[in-house]
Amino acid sequence: MATVIAKVKVMPTSPEVEKEALKETLKELVENNDAKCRGVSDEPLAFGLYTVFVMVEMEEKEGGMDPIEEAMNALENVESAEVVELSLV
């Protein structure tokens, strides 16, 4: 099977969400879903808001990134999470 690399864009619920804690939570979530976290970064957006990007590496399988994306969206401090890039390696 092929390896999939995905870039997930995560928007926190507010600027008050602790950035480093959110990044650590996302990294743990990825690793608990049979995937590797290849990196977590953040970019300022506006008015104190920021976007977190998570690079995920996993084996190609049925359902793909859906379980990880759904788990990220279910987190308390996450407004939205969506896969913005996907490629096979």
From Swiss-Prot:
The keyword Protein biosynthesis applies. Keywords: Elongation factor, Protein biosynthesis. GO terms for molecular function: translation elongation factor activity. InterPro entries: eEF-1beta-like_sf, EF1B_bsu/dsu_GNE, Transl_elong_EF1B/ribsomal_bS6, Transl_elong_EF1B_B_arc. Promotes the exchange of GDP for GTP in EF-1-alpha/GDP, thus allowing the regeneration of EF-1-alpha/GTP that could then be used to form the ternary complex EF-1-alpha/GTP/AAtRNA. Belongs to the EF-1-beta/EF-1-delta family. NCBIfam families: aEF-1_beta, PRK00435.1. This is Elongation factor 1-beta.
